[in-house]
Amino acid sequence: MHDQPKYIPLRPSAFFNDARSARPVIEGTVARGQLHDDELMYGGKVNGQEATVFPMRVDAAVMARGQERFNIYCSPCHGRTGQGDGMVVLRGYRRPPSMHQDRLRNAPVGHFFDVMSNGFGAMPDYAAQIAAEDRWAIIAYIRALQLSEHATIADVPPAERSRIP
């Protein structure tokens, strides 16, 4: 196998007219497993409108993943509780909005997906860093943070109330 004819990437080739051994990707080519044609899961929209529902079932595992990813990617700016008081603010950067303001509490979940995917204002896009499934998990965790800010005992299921000190 060592002594067989082959093209070594980034070395010149006399075979092709452009003299490159590494072939350019053909326009419109989609890598295997990367089609992402589910508008809700990968675009955060339903019929072109920001989604109001999650594309998957939100359970304890999704919430735990969302908390983990939120703490990694979001808390440096937004803080661990979503108040907009992360460590970058302490270093002089512009304060991001609190996740608890009415505008964001009332925003559809698709809005958060769009902002994480494409950026907004001073926030850069995170589509390349955070997988779509993880963006949805983060949104579920943000919704939990928002609910916790204004929760009452009536919001707690009766079976769980006895665990509250």
Task: Report the location of each language-model feature.
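A generic secondary-structure boundary signal that marks alpha-helix termini
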Residues: 10, 39, 75, 121, ...
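Periplasmic c-type cytochrome electron-transfer domains
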Residues: 2-61, 130-141
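Phosphate-coordinating loops and pocket residues in cytosolic domains that bind phosphorylated ligands
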Residues: 3, 79, 101
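Sequence/structural segment immediately N-terminal to covalent heme-attachment motifs in c-type
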Residues: 59-83, 89, 96, 111, ...
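Short, glycine/charged-enriched secondary-structure capping and boundary segments
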Residues: 16, 90-92
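Flexible coil segments in periplasmic/lumen-exposed cytochrome c-class electron-transfer proteins
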Residues: 71, 88, 96, 103-109, ...
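A general structural signal marking secondary-structure boundaries and capping sites
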Residues: 5, 81, 120, 146-149
